[in-house]
């Protein structure tokens, strides 16, 4: 079974980095409602669009998701 997106993303945390992946990782870590146990694109994307306590460029999210899928 694939590691959840959140679990994979947490390996990219670096609060000092300006890379989109590291920024998203830090924002997701701080948002207690972020979906932690899914590998479903629609679920995570919908959360970012409708429920996240932060804003993030969804085009950058798509690129990060592609990297996650390739991992």
Curated annotation (Swiss-Prot):
Pfam families, A to Z:
YozE_SAM_like
The lineage's top-level taxon is Bacteria
Q: List the disulfide bonds.
A: none
Check the record and name the Gene3D superfamilies matching this protein. YozE SAM-like (1.10.150.260)
Q: Which InterPro entries match?
A: UPF0346, YozE_SAM-like, YozE_SAM-like_sf
The family note in this entry says:
Belongs to the UPF0346 family.
Q: What is this protein called?
A: UPF0346 protein SSA_1617
- According to its UniProt entry, this protein's organism is Streptococcus sanguinis (strain SK36)
């Amino acid at each position: 079974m694939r590691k959840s997106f959140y679990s994979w993303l947490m390996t990219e945390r670096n609060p000092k980095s300006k890379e989109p992946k590291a920024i998203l990782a830090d924002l997701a870590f701080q948002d207690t409602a972020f979906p932690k146990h899914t590998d479903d694109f629609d679920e995570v994307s919908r959360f970012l669009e409708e429920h996240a306590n932060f804003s993030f460029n969804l085009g950058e999210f798509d690129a990060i998701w592609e990297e996650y899928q390739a991992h």
